Design a protein with these regions (language model features):
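Long, hydrophobic, well-ordered secondary-structure blocks that form the structural core
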Residues: 111-177
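Alpha-helical bundle segments that constitute or directly flank the non-heme di-iron/ferroxidase center
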Residues: 8, 85-115, 132-138
Length: 181
């Protein structure tokens, strides 16, 4: 495993993360690269892969693209109005937790993994993954905007909920450990 974690020499144009650059001007044979900690990425080539599974996963994720606004929530609004106060609490708490989780998943993979990524197909897969998490979060926002007259009343309480904060800690601590290596 020792060679897997060795970094390439750093040029002055590279960032604080050893080996990372926005665009490597040297040709890199990504078919022979490790998934992580290889040479910095160059041209995003999607014609040859070391791991074609990541490209298939990227294509599959892109096929799931949708916009929350494309779905009518008129029935949901009426159904929500019929819930008991306890059911509304569970419904809202779940949405708040999902928004927190998707907020993390919408940014953490890029912050934690992409700086060390050595394969364009993996970089693309993680980028699309983050994008899909943002779509999820937007869908929860769309639901809240449709069932509450003042959505800010809900959003403003997310960071005041100790249950959500403790769950966020369990999700974010590993990402933060990697980011702060």
């Amino acid at each position: 495993l020792g060679d897997v974690y060795k970094r390439q020499p750093v040029s002055p144009a590279q960032s604080d993360i050893t080996g990372m650059t926005v665009f490597n001007k040297k040709a890199v044979d990504t078919a022979k690269q490790y998934m992580f900690f290889g040479a910095p990425l160059s041209v995003q080539r999607y014609d040859s892969y070391r791991y074609p599974t990541f490209d298939r996963l990227t294509q599959q994720q892109l096929g799931y693209f949708w916009r929350p606004e494309e779905v009518s929530l008129q029935k949901d609004r009426a159904d929500y109005a019929q819930l008991t106060e306890q059911q509304k609490h569970i419904f809202t708490s779940n949405l708040k937790y999902q928004i927190m989780l998707d907020s993390v998943q919408g940014r953490a993979p890029g912050m934690a993994f992409i700086p060390f990524c050595s394969l364009p197909e993996l970089e693309a897969c993680m980028t699309v993954w983050q994008f899909m998490e943002m779509i999820h979060s937007r869908s929860y926002t769309y639901i809240i905007k449709n069932v509450y007259s003042n959505p800010s009343d809900i959003f403003d309480t997310i960071l005041e909920d100790n249950n959500i904060l403790s769950r966020a800690e369990s999700v974010t601590k590993s990402y933060l450990s990697l980011i702060h290596i």
